[in-house]
């Protein structure tokens, strides 16, 4: 189910505060986050986030096409090793 429109998007307040501080100081540093459920807002465009996938941090550079999506969509948690070759059953 999607989130109700009357509630608005969820953005972690700590993450929002960090981006606001970086925008004010005009610095470009990597922002570490564990908040995979946070929605990407237009203020995040141009910043690099290190999104935790449960094991390590995956760097994600935010572009305009990513606005409205969530951080978890860009850091996969599972690795696909491939199916067994034919005859290897």
From Swiss-Prot:
UniProt keyword annotations, A-Z: Ribonucleoprotein, Ribosomal protein, RNA-binding, rRNA-binding
GO molecular function, one term: structural constituent of ribosome
Record's keyword annotation contains Acetylation: no
Pfam families: Ribosomal_S19
SUPFAM superfamilies the UniProt entry points to: Ribosomal protein S19 (SSF54570)
Database matches in InterPro entries: Ribosomal_uS19, Ribosomal_uS19_bac-type, Ribosomal_uS19_CS, Ribosomal_uS19_SF
GO biological process, one term: translation
Keyword check for Transcription: no
GO CC annotations on file: cytoplasm; small ribosomal subunit
Family: Belongs to the universal ribosomal protein uS19 family.
Family matches, as NCBIfam families: rpsS_bact
Function, in words: Protein S19 forms a complex with S13 that binds strongly to the 16S ribosomal RNA.
Protein name: Small ribosomal subunit protein uS19
Organism: Cytophaga hutchinsonii (strain ATCC 33406 / DSM 1761 / CIP 103989 / NBRC 15051 / NCIMB 9469 / D465)
